[in-house]
């Protein structure tokens, strides 16, 4: 009996969407939901930006507009300093939330919106291709249907004519001949159409569907990978947040790092994969006359379980030979043949198409004699892209419906293997055929070992914390359907809840209702409890023992430290699972709770479990205990339902396990084996295709009688084998411990004596060979499943084979396996090293591509560009030497084929086109000079090809790392990236190179950029050969660089109503700093009709102002009384201010109406610029002059008021600038990037922001303000240039707000330089607002 290899899953090959050949509709819906998820993410983060922005503004206004009642003068300078720091911390908190808004917009919202557009376009293209493929297949099936109908019609006519032709006229005979000829022709057409349809079906299933599914998988891989990278970059940018946010950020980073697009795909495939097999090819169905049939014989006895198919249908076997069949089949034979035909095409496909459905329904009547009408069935509207199960049978569906009705009428419809809500005895009967030696329900064994695999004993709150209800119901449904596929990363709480659910839902509890009262009465009596257990059926006793053993291990003190579940806690949880009260009185129910707990607790603490055989394929061996060991490893792979049986009786016979021999026979065989001079050789690593060596294989239904094997218990473990690095045959037995292992080898030797000796595999592509020499008596065969995994190759051709010790020196092709298989075989340390190595590969991939984009698109120095290209080349050569020379002797073509074959996409193998634009390197003469420009083109070509090559290498290594289990190989790959830094070193000596120096530098660099292996023609022709490769796109400073970049921009009139700004101002005339003031100080007060706007008050940094009569007489202080000018004092408060970096000068406007006739006394007016107090001292040799004192007092009060007014204007100006620049940002975010006017507006806002930022940067550097370092935003090179311009402008605005708020928080004193710097921007904004108001009116 052979096994269809196409249906046997290859554990080495990672599962993909191509395995879901009948799941296009499911995958398509899942991909659409993935796009909806991206939209949900953007919607959520947009709302979060609004909240963060509002909160940031509220905190900023609280600090900046807070008016203290005690600004100064109170006791406690340290308290004042502390209070200032608290306000500054609040401002820092506000800036933090502002930074969050910027990071979310830059790193999440904008990239994901672009990704959504790209995914939707590509999904639309895939759907169009899928629809074409489906329609083509539909047409082929419709043609076959038509040919079948024509054949059946002609056959029917021929039979009718033949029946009346005897003894009739010659005309009737000619009609019969003509009808026979038509039948022959129709028969040929029918057969030809079958071949054509089968060809179309084969192409559809093996080429078109896999391509479509692979395209969808590629989109999903990209989506998950890109979203992960966006999240990662966002939270990486938040690492500089305050310490109180670090914990949450670190946890989120760990969760993000745990995202693996390949694991996500594997989990989806595992949950979506059905047990349907490929539909069999269309078969020729001869015409059967359904009209002339005698009455059917009595129905056969179908009580035998062999008559039930795995899907619950009836498989009726007819015992009559072909010779005894009548000419026309009976109704029963028709039913049997029809059922067989249906079984042959079970698990087939069906297309949801209007045309096909109509054809199928309308054509059914041609071959159905029970219904002569041609009434079509009601059409059903198909789904958009629904590829459902479609049938390869073109016969009528009414026969199947009739058969199903007959099955239901006689009560034979099977429920498909329900294991919940049924009796435990029924489960044992149903699974007896597949697992005859299993003493307890299979579901208990499976769940227990799954719990052990998920480290149940170290899980806090296990059995107490409930699992996810949706996941529990999903697993329950799948288990009832016979699908035991469970993800390796399934939540342990879900599995634990499923075990409790099964115990609660079985029809009769393990302690039946008849003994419930006894259990309650003797809850504290151990002997009585043990008697009650011994009185139970043996099946109940062993099931209880199997579960109690798990609970006892869980309640050990060593494990309780971690899971917090001691015996009382476990008893409280499991008492409702073991006992059920039949009473409905709430008082009785509540009163029995503690007694139930006490009863179960006594069982867990003191009951000694019985020995239970959990072997799936044979009785327990004599050398091992039949009781289950908790600490042994879990199930190798998910099994199928034990309730499913084979449809073929022969298959059932072949799947019957080998009966154990008697003890005497075993002793005789053992003695013969010990006396034999030629011991049996180990099993070959290549397995027979007729045998599936998986302990719990989903397809283990048949086993060749020539390949018997030792019954393997579920708890058997192979954790001592290092699959990736050990030879296929392991010497584990020596002369000292040979006797200890005799019992373990006994059953293997019994089976091996029946087979020919086989030698181990010598290479990955060899087949089974005969052993020329006997093996040593110390060789022990590796598990056949492991041999099968190791023997199969799935990837790159093996260039050379090393010494066989691991992967060192040989290609990893023979050892690649699915990531889930690697995780299952690995311990925590190996997985941690693997994750660290994979993360390092991803980081280097990101750094290389970002560095390449920087040196080819952003303005930089020649030295920086050359150093960066040398670093990239050095890393490339290191990887190239490792892959092509030192390690595996691969070629670049081998690597590309491996990437394509195994679908390596993490990190993605990006290929850049060679840019057509020259890089922006300084000096700019490089591009203008002919010689240097040619050198630059050669350098640009070499760097691009090198980056493409290193992307291929990193993609290959990233895929290999997660698919191998070899510590040596992982260590060798990790050493490649140890302490490797891709950050170019800056050297101030080479910042300003001349044209000649730069040319020489490029020449020397070019000589070092040559790869180890020359570039191939495909690589050199990358621009021609690959049309959809990536070109590095980034933010272009040219969009906002103008000669007058320091001047505010002119914004288009189209959006003046939105911008509230128009016109332009030339800021080149605005002085950013004034000349230093002289040592003398003059206080001037002028009242003049012609100079009302030029009243200046200059105060030097000197702490005193000396006012004397002589200075007054010399007009050092001049006061002109003019009452006519009093009304003009406040007409023009704007004053031209000047200051220097070394002194503080204050300019104000003062108007006095004071009589200056008394100039006889000398007065020293001491005014402190940092305080509002003023004291006057008069010379001792002069008399006090009250008039002069009054003048000075009034002057001081006026100066103080003007200073306060200027401080208010100064603060208000900063607030206005902050509000203005934030409004510009809101406006920019609301503009449509595709509109030309909006693009002009964005450029204008960018110019304004850049000019203001540069001015503030110069001011802070000259004034010595301590502003936190600027961090350049991360630019996505694939974005549009205006998208990147928008990102940079947002960064400029955030920097402006940060500088202004920090300056204001450090010092509230009036600063004339900053005032002069900001005033033109504010005036320009006010003028634009006025113009807009006029235009609107």
From Swiss-Prot:
Residues 279-328, 345-392, 612-689, 733-781, 794-821, 1041-1102, 1114-1166 are annotated as: Disordered. Its main location: cytoplasm. It comes from Dictyostelium discoideum (Social amoeba). Residues 293-302 have a biased composition (Pro residues). Residues 830-859, 1189-1219 form a coiled coil. It is found in: Cytoplasm; Contractile vacuole. Residues 345-358, 1047-1063 have a biased composition (Polar residues). Rho GTPase-activating protein involved in the signal transduction pathway. This is GTPase activating protein homolog 3. Residues 14-264 form the F-BAR domain.
């Amino acid at each position: 009996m052979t096994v269809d290899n196409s249906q046997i899953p290859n554990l080495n090959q990672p599962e993909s969407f191509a395995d879901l050949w009948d799941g296009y509709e499911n995958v398509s819906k899942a991909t659409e939901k993935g796009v909806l998820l991206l939209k949900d993410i953007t919607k959520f983060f947009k709302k979060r930006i609004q909240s963060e922005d509002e909160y940031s503004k509220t905190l900023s206004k609280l600090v900046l507009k807070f008016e203290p009642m005690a600004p100064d003068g109170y006791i406690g300078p340290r308290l004042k300093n502390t209070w200032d720091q608290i306000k500054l911390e609040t401002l820092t908190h506000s800036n933090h939330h502002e930074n969050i808004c910027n990071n979310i917009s830059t790193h999440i919202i904008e990239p994901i919106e672009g990704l959504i557009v790209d995914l939707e376009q590509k999904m639309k293209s895939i759907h169009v291709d899928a629809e074409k493929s489906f329609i083509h297949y539909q047409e082929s099936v419709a043609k076959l249907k038509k040919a079948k109908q024509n054949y059946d019609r002609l056959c029917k006519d021929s039979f009718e004519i033949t029946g009346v032709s005897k003894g009739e006229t010659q005309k009737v005979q000619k009609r019969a001949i003509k009808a026979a000829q038509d039948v022959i022709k129709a028969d040929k057409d029918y057969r030809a159409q079958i071949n054509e349809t089968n060809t179309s079906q084969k192409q559809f299933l093996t080429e078109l569907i896999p391509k479509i599914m692979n395209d969808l998988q590629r989109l999903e891989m990209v989506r998950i990978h890109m979203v992960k990278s966006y999240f990662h970059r966002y939270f990486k940018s938040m690492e500089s947040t305050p310490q109180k946010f670090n914990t949450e950020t670190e946890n989120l980073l760990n969760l993000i790092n745990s995202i693996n697009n390949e694991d996500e795909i594997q989990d989806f495939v595992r949950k979506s994969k059905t047990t349907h097999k490929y539909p069999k090819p269309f078969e020729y169905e001869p015409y059967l006359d359904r009209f002339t049939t005698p009455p059917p014989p009595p129905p056969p006895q179908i009580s035998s379980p062999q008559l039930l198919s795995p899907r619950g249908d009836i498989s009726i076997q007819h015992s009559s030979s072909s010779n005894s069949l009548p000419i026309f089949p009976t109704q029963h034979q028709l039913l049997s043949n029809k059922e067989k035909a249906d079984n042959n095409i079970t698990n087939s496909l069906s297309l949801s198409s209007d045309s096909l459905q109509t054809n199928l329904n309308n054509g059914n009547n041609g071959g159905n004699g029970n219904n002569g009408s041609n009434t079509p069935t009601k059409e059903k509207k198909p789904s958009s892209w629904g590829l459902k199960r479609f049938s390869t049978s073109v016969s009528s569906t009414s026969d199947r419906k009739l058969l199903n009705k007959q099955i239901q009428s006689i009560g034979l419809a099977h429920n498909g293997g329900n294991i919940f809500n049924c009796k435990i005895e029924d489960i044992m009967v149903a699974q007896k055929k597949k697992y005859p030696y299993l003493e307890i329900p299979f579901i208990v064994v499976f769940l227990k070992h799954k719990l052990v695999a998920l480290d149940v004993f170290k899980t806090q709150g296990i059995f107490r914390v409930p699992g996810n209800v949706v996941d529990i119901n999903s697993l329950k449904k799948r288990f009832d359907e016979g699908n035991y596929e469970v993800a390796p990363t399934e939540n342990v709480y879900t599995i634990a809840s499923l075990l409790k659910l099964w115990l609660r839902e079985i029809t009769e509890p393990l302690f039946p209702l008849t003994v419930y009262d006894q259990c309650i009465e003797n809850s504290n009596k151990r002997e009585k409890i043990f008697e009650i257990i011994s009185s139970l059926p043996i099946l109940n006793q062993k099931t209880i023992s199997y579960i109690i053993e798990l609970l006892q291990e869980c309640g050990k003190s060593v494990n309780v430290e971690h899971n917090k579940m001691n015996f009382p806690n476990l008893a409280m949880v499991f008492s409702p699972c073991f006992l059920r009260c039949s009473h409905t009185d709430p008082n009785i129910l509540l009163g029995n709770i503690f007694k139930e707990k006490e009863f179960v607790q006594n069982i867990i603490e003191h009951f000694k479990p019985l020995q239970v055989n959990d072997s799936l394929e044979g009785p327990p061996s004599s050398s091992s205990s039949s009781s289950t060991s908790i600490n042994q490893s879990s199930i190798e792979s998910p099994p199928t339902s034990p309730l499913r049986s084979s449809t073929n009786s022969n298959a059932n016979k072949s799947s019957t396990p080998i009966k154990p021999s008697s003890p005497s026979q075993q002793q005789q065989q053992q003695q013969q084996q010990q006396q034999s001079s030629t011991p049996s050789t180990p099993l070959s690593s290549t397995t027979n295709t007729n045998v599936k060596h998986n302990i719990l294989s989903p397809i283990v239904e048949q086993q060749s009688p020539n390949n018997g094997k030792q019954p393997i218990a579920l708890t058997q473990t192979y954790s001592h084998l290092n699959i990736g690095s050990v030879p296929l045959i392991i010497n584990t037995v020596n002369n000292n411990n040979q006797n200890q292992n005799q019992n373990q080898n006994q059953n293997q030797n019994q089976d091996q004596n029946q087979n020919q000796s086989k030698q181990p595999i010598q290479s990955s592509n060899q087949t089974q060979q005969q052993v020329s020499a006997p093996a040593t008596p110390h060789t022990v065969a590796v598990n056949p499943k492991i041999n099968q995994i190791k023997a199969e190759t799935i990837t790159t051709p093996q260039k050379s084979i090393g010494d066989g010790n691991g992967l060192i020196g040989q290609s990893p092709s023979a050892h690649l396996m699915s990531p889930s298989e690697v995780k299952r075989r690995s311990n925590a340390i190996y997985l941690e090293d693997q994750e660290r190595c994979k993360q390092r590969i991803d980081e280097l991939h990101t750094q290389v591509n970002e560095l390449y984009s920087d040196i080819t698109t952003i303005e930089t120095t020649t030295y920086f560009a050359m150093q960066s290209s040398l670093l990239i080349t050095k890393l490339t050569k290191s990887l190239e030497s490792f892959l092509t020379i030192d390690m595996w002797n691969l070629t670049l073509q081998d690597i590309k084929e491996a990437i394509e074959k195994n679908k390596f996409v993490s990190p993605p193998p990006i290929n850049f086109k060679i840019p057509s634009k020259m890089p922006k390197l300084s000096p700019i003469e490089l591009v203008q000079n002919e010689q240097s420009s040619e050198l630059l083109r050669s350098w640009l070509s070499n760097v691009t090809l090198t980056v493409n090559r290193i992307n291929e290498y990193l993609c290959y290594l990233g895929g290999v790392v997660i698919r191998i289990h070899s510590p040596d190989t992982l260590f060798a790959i990790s050493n490649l990236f140890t302490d490797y830094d891709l950050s170019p070193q800056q050297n101030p000596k080479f910042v300003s190179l001349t044209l000649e120096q730069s040319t020489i530098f490029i020449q020397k660099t070019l000589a070092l950029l040559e790869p180890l292996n020359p570039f191939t023609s495909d690589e050199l022709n990358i621009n021609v050969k690959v049309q959809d490769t990536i070109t590095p796109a980034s933010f272009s400073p040219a969009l906002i660089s103008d000669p007058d970049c320091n001047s505010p921009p002119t914004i288009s009139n189209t959006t003046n109503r939105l911008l509230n700004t128009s016109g332009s101002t030339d800021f080149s005339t605005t002085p950013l700093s004034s000349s230093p003031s002289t040592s003398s100080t003059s206080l001037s007060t002028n009242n003049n009709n012609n100079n009302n706007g030029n009243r200046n008050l200059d105060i030097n940094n000197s702490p005193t102002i000396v006012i004397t009569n002589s200075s007054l007489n010399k007009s050092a202080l001049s006061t002109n009384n003019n009452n006519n000018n009093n009304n003009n004092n406040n007409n023009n408060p704007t004053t031209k201010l000047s200051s220097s970096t070394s002194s503080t000068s204050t300019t104000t406007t003062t108007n006095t109406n004071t009589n200056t006739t008394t100039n006889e006394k000398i007065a020293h007016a001491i005014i402190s610029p940092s305080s509002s107090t003023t004291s006057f001292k008069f010379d001792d040799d002069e008399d006090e002059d009250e008039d002069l004192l009054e003048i000075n007092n009034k002057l001081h009060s006026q100066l103080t008021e003007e200073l306060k007014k200027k401080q208010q204007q100064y603060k208000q100006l900063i607030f206005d600038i902050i509000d203005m620049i934030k409004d510009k940002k809101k406006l920019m975010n609301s503009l449509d990037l595709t509109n030309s006017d909006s693009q002009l507006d964005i450029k204008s806002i960018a110019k304004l922001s850049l000019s203001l930022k540069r001015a503030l940067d110069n001011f802070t550097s000259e004034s010595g303000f301590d502003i936190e370092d600027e961090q350049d935003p991360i630019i996505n090179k694939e974005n549009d240039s205006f998208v990147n311009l928008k990102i940079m402008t947002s960064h400029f605005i955030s920097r402006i707000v940060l500088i202004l708020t920090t300056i204001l928080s450090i010092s509230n004193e009036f600063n004339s330089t900053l005032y002069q710097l900001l005033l033109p921007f504010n005036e320009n904004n006010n003028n634009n607002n006025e113009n807009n108001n006029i235009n609107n009116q």
